[in-house]
């Protein structure tokens, strides 16, 4: 294998891409084939056999789903492609978010029998949020029910995308043989068992007419993207291959079009043209606008261009604890150059760190390199303080990039070590896991002393418990899953908080008059603090203490001790004492005022509501809907996808525990579901009473 040193390539020859898809669309298989044909692998891994390169954690090998996005480097026709494999399961949305943040483009893989499935919509929206250019690959063309044009149509109806098929399939289902390239107007057939040998031939006579028609449709859509081409098209002039590619590339990078290809990754068909499309249509780091950051010294906006001579800037998008090498920090370089052994400044933490080794990752193997440059995706060793979302930069020019936002956890689980010897190991293991996964929260319940882990769903926490056993050798006992309830208020209220202590020597004096108001859910804020005092009744230096007192009180609401959310706190008035006032006194006074105001403001309990999408054969629909109704669910839509029915419902999280087992028995194992957090909503009074009683 050529050394990586020899294979540093120019920036315009780098592609940083992700492969995104619904859980079973064949994304990992597609990645495997890409690695095989680009020469990084000597045998083809198969997810069903558990030998896939990117699925390298034991849990993934067993479950056949991708959990941790692995970064892999490969080469194709002189271009370097860095691939970040992203999970398609909703409990791992955070992994997808952070991968998309550092990518330049993506391949969206779809199952040609289903087209856009629920999870593909979620991932697509996340990619929209970060303006990631995409090409689409309709996979599984050999599967019964495969329908290329139906699948393409779902991109329009479900995702409002502008798909432009640049290929058409030759046959489908068991007769799928290859593809017709509508730009070159050639047929491509794969002639060897492993798919590494393929050849271009003339289009068979019986397909010529359809191919002409499909090419015409493609040209029409391409012409809509560019004035010059439109004129040529209307004049009936010849449009060259180069012109089509140039216009498509520009439109893809600007997110105005999605080139669509097809194939059957498992049957080794369609991968090489897909790699060509990555090079032809997805951006290099040079095609994208400079990255935006803020200068630490004065908060001014600065832009960093992908240039080795600019100050070094990189974003940490993942942390992994490797059993042999220790902490691996994955980062994307936006500007400048970093040598191994040199110092780097973590501007998020305000700490200087030394990067002792730099490695390029190939799923679970590593290749050491001496330096990194713009566009590189690498992992560093020795960065002890760095966490996901941190900015690494040049100490002389400290800047900070925008952080990655992660959703709050909605489900908790109490865990305890099975034996005394597991106790110390558990603390270390949880620390390591929460470093890797920003959506995993770990806390110790002050009253019971129990360790509570919180995450994004039942599967998320199951896998955490599983990893504790396997990777860290910690055996734990697990409690029942608990819902992360919240408390809020329905009306505004005012209250006074006074904290006065006169003992010998210096006293304590804090006095606050506070108004609290509900923040509407659509504002998306959990807390806002406003100082409306006038005339210096409370000196400004005590305001941070007042805010801290309120925030502390919000950690435990009056109804059942759950955290309080969606509150606007306004300090109206108060008073202070020249000698006796202190931060402590105002913190306590604010906390007292808040607790008093909460009682008057009609506090209510909120519960997480999940969006549930169930795909089932029609005959089980009645039973499934009846069961949903018994779980306080609201059915929002019924759709038909091929020969299956899809039920979309909103259901309280508390009613979903163990749902996988129920659904299996209701449908004889033939229905599947995905569930993700939707929003918080007020708990009905009768149910709220029960929850409050238990507490």
UniProtKB/Swiss-Prot annotation:
A GO molecular function held by the record: GTPase activity
GO cellular component terms, A-Z: cytoplasm
Gene3D superfamilies registered for this protein in UniProt: 3.30.230.10, 3.30.70.240, Elongation Factor G (Translational Gtpase), domain 3, P-loop containing nucleotide triphosphate hydrolases, Translation factors
Keyword annotations from UniProtKB, A to Z: Cytoplasm, Elongation factor, GTP-binding, Nucleotide-binding, Protein biosynthesis
Signal peptide (UniProt feature, chain positions): none
InterPro entries named in the record: EF-G-like_DII (IPR053905), EFG_II (IPR041095), EFG_III (IPR009022), EFG_III/V (IPR035647), EFG_IV (IPR047872), EFG_V (IPR035649), EFG_V-like (IPR000640), G_TR_CS (IPR031157)
Cross-referenced Pfam families: EF-G_D2, EFG_C, EFG_III, EFG_IV, GTP_EFTU
Subcellular location: Cytoplasm
Binding site for GTP: 21-28, 85-89, 139-142
GO biological process: ribosome disassembly
Protein function: Catalyzes the GTP-dependent ribosomal translocation step during translation elongation. During this step, the ribosome changes from the pre-translocational (PRE) to the post-translocational (POST) state as the newly formed A-site-bound peptidyl-tRNA and P-site-bound deacylated tRNA move to the P and E sites, respectively. Catalyzes the coordinated movement of the two tRNA molecules, the mRNA and conformational changes in the ribosome.
Family: Belongs to the TRAFAC class translation factor GTPase superfamily. Classic translation factor GTPase family. EF-G/EF-2 subfamily.
PANTHER family, per the entry: RIBOSOME-RELEASING FACTOR 2, MITOCHONDRIAL, TRANSLATION ELONGATION FACTOR G-RELATED
Protein name, UniProt field: Elongation factor G
Organism: Thermotoga neapolitana (strain ATCC 49049 / DSM 4359 / NBRC 107923 / NS-E)
Lineage, opening ranks: Bacteria, Thermotogati, Thermotogota, Thermotogae, Thermotogales
Gene (UniProt): fusA
